[in-house]
Amino acid sequence: MVPSSPAVEKQVPVEPGPDPELRSWRHLVCYLCFYGFMAQIRPGESFITPYLLGPDKNFTREQVTNEITPVLSYSYLAVLVPVFLLTDYLRYTPVLLLQGLSFVSVWLLLLLGHSVAHMQLMELFYSVTMAARIAYSSYIFSLVRPARYQRVAGYSRAAVLLGVFTSSVLGQLLVTVGRVSFSTLNYISLAFLTFSVVLALFLKRPKRSLFFNRDDRGRCETSASELERMNPGPGGKLGHALRVACGDSVLARMLRELGDSLRRPQLRLWSLWWVFNSAGYYLVVYYVHILWNEVDPTTNSARVYNGAADAASTLLGAITSFAAGFVKIRWARWSKLLIAGVTATQAGLVFLLAHTRHPSSIWLCYAAFVLFRGSYQFLVPIATFQIASSLSKELCALVFGVNTFFATIVKTIITFIVSDVRGLGLPVRKQFQLYSVYFLILSIIYFLGAMLDGLRHCQRGHHPRQPPAQGLRSAAEEKAAQALSVQDKGLGGLQPAQSPPLSPEDSLGAVGPASLEQRQSDPYLAQAPAPQAAEFLSPVTTPSPCTLCSAQASGPEAADETCPQLAVHPPGVSKLGLQCLPSDGVQNVNQ
C-alpha cells in the first residue's frame, strides 16, 4: 500500500461535478419535441371546410367565404402582439397551455356550434393558437446553451413537420379507407388535443426568457459601481443615470439596433419579402379548401382528398426547406432574381388554381397547391438565414415579430377589401384571380430590382473606380512588369509571392540604356524621364505590402504571402511608384 502524501494528492485533478443542464437537456428536448408532435395530430383539420359546407353544419359557401373565414385575419391581428409579449413575460409554458386550451375550444365549437357567430368565435380561438406558435419555437432555446441552438431548432422543426404530415395522412386514411365521417374525425381530433393539453401541464418552466426575464440587473449595478470608482461625482449622479438607463436599456437598445439594421440591403429585401409574400401565401392557404369544394362539390366524403394534398405539400415543403440549406450563390447579387423567379412561379400556380373548373381536374388543383406551398417553404429558411445572420438573438426575434405583424396588417387589409361582406365580398374564384395578379405584380417589382442591380454592376465593371492621375490598365501593368524582367535574367520572369526581395545589384541592372528602349516601346513609360524612372525603379530592401491589406498587421512576410496583388507586383519592386489597394486597384503614391 503506497502512503498518500500532500504532493501526490495535489497532482490528482479534481473532476467537476456533472452539470444538471447537461444531464437533463436531452430529456427536456425530447419531451418538448414529443409535445410538439402530438399537438399537431388533428386529423380533422384538413376537412373542416367540407364539414362546414356538408349536411352536418349546412353553411353556404358565401357564409364560409365572406363571413366566417375573414374573422381569422382580424382576430389574428388583434391577438398577435399581446400573445407575443405574454409569451416572453410568462416564460412560455403558460402560453403553450393557453394554446392547447384554445385548440380544445376550437373543436368544441366546431362540434357543438350551429350558427355563424359560433363559427366566428371558433376562428377567434384558432387565431390564438396561431399566435401562440411563437411560444413553442422560442421555448426550446431556453432549455439549452447557445452552442446547441442549431441542433435543437432542427429537432423541434422536424417534430412539427412530422406531426403535420402524420395528421394529414391519418385523416385521409380514416376518411378514404375507414369511411369515417367528418364528425367522427373531429371527435378523434378533440381526443388528441386533450392529450396534448395534459402533456403541456408537465412542461418545465424556464427561469429566463429573451426580453423580460433577463439577468441584467447585476451587470448594470456592477457597471455603475465600477464607473463611480473610476469617475466619482457629487451624489452619485453617474450611477443613478446608469441605473435609470438599465431600466429601459432593452427596448431603447433594440430599437436603435433595429434602426441601424434597416440600412442593410439584404435585411430590407428579405423583410419586404416576408411581409408581402407571406401575406399572399396565407391568403391562398386560408381559402384553397373552399376553392377545392367549388371545383368538386361532392357529397361523398371518400372522394375528398384534402388530407392527401396537405400531406404532400408538407412533405415537399420539408424537402425544399432542407435543400435550401445547400444553395450556394452570391446572395447580394442574385437574391432579387431568385425571389422574382419563385414569385412568378407562384403567380402562375395561383392562376391555374383560379381557372380550374371541371371536377375531374381537382387533382390539378391539388398539384398546383402542393407546388405553391413547396416553393414558399423553399424561401423561408433562406429568408430566415439572411435576416438572422447578422443580428443578435433578441434583435432577431424582434425583427421576425415586426415582419409578421406587418404581414398580418397587409393580409387583413386585403381580406377586408376582397373577401369581407362589408367590402367587395368576392366569390372565392375571383379572389384567386386577384391573388395571382398580386403575385405577378410582386414578381415584376423584384425583376425590375434585379435588372437595376445588374445595370449598376455592369456600369461598375466598365468604369472601375481609379484615381484621376492613373490611366493604367491591368494589361499595361503586366507589360511593364514583363519589361522589367527582360532586363535581368536573374529575375526569371515574375516573382512568386514567397520570393525574397531583389538585391541592389539586380535592381540597378534594370536601369540603363535598355530603359530608354522600354520607354520608347511603352507609351506609359515614355511619359517619365529617365532619372525619374530610375528614382521610381529604385529597389527597396523590404517588401512593400499592399496598403490596407489585412495581413499587413502580422508583418511584411505574412502580407506578401496572402496579398493577391503580388502576382502582378513582385515583392521588393516598387513598380513606377505604384501601390496596390484591394478596393481601388493601383494608386500612384508619388502624387
Curated annotation (Swiss-Prot):
Swapping residue 133 to A leads to an effect described as: Reduces methotrexate uptake. Reduces IRF3 phosphorylation upon cGAMP stimulation
Q: What is the effect of changing residue 48 to F?
A: No effect on methotrexate uptake but shifts selectivity towards folinate and pemetrexed
Q: Sugar-bearing residues?
A: 58
Which intervals lie on the Cytoplasmic side per UniProt? 1-29, 88-91, 140-153, 203-266, 328-333, 385-398, 456-591
* Catalytic activity as recorded in UniProt: 5-amino-1-(5-phospho-beta-D-ribosyl)imidazole-4-carboxamide(in) + (6S)-5-methyl-5,6,7,8-tetrahydrofolate(out) = 5-amino-1-(5-phospho-beta-D-ribosyl)imidazole-4-carboxamide(out) + (6S)-5-methyl-5,6,7,8-tetrahydrofolate(in); 2',3'-cGAMP(out) + 5-amino-1-(5-phospho-beta-D-ribosyl)imidazole-4-carboxamide(in) = 2',3'-cGAMP(in) + 5-amino-1-(5-phospho-beta-D-ribosyl)imidazole-4-carboxamide(out); 3',3'-cGAMP(out) + 5-amino-1-(5-phospho-beta-D-ribosyl)imidazole-4-carboxamide(in) = 3',3'-cGAMP(in) + 5-amino-1-(5-phospho-beta-D-ribosyl)imidazole-4-carboxamide(out)
What name does this protein carry?
Reduced folate transporter
Q: What is the effect of changing residue 348 to R?
A: In IMD114; likely pathogenic; decreased function in positive regulation of cGAS/STING signaling pathway and altered activation of immune response; no effect on localization to the cell membrane
Q: Which GO terms describe its molecular function?
A: 2',3'-cyclic GMP-AMP binding; antiporter activity; cyclic-GMP-AMP transmembrane transporter activity; folate:monoatomic anion antiporter activity; folic acid binding; folic acid transmembrane transporter activity; methotrexate transmembrane transporter activity; organic anion transmembrane transporter activity
